Amino acid sequence: MSKTVVRKNESLDDALRRFKRSVTKAGTLQESRKREFYEKPSVKRKRKSEAARKRKKF
């Protein structure tokens, strides 16, 4: 979990920007979206192989 402490004389906008950056860097939002719904193992494998195929293409 990302935690941001507001520094002395720091605006709320700056603290929010730092928090958003830390959440993005940690991948918290992507992880929660990925786990929002159950994904069958066969669908996971298919998605993973398609992503590998896309990466290989370029």
Swiss-Prot record:
The UniProt record lists the keyword Membrane: no
Cleavable signal peptide: none
Keywords: Ribonucleoprotein, Ribosomal protein
InterPro entries registered for this protein in UniProt: Ribosomal_bS21 (IPR001911), Ribosomal_bS21_CS (IPR018278), Ribosomal_bS21_sf (IPR038380)
Superkingdom to which the source organism belongs: Bacteria
Region spans: Disordered: 36-58
Protein name as annotated: Small ribosomal subunit protein bS21
Gene that this polypeptide is encoded by: rpsU
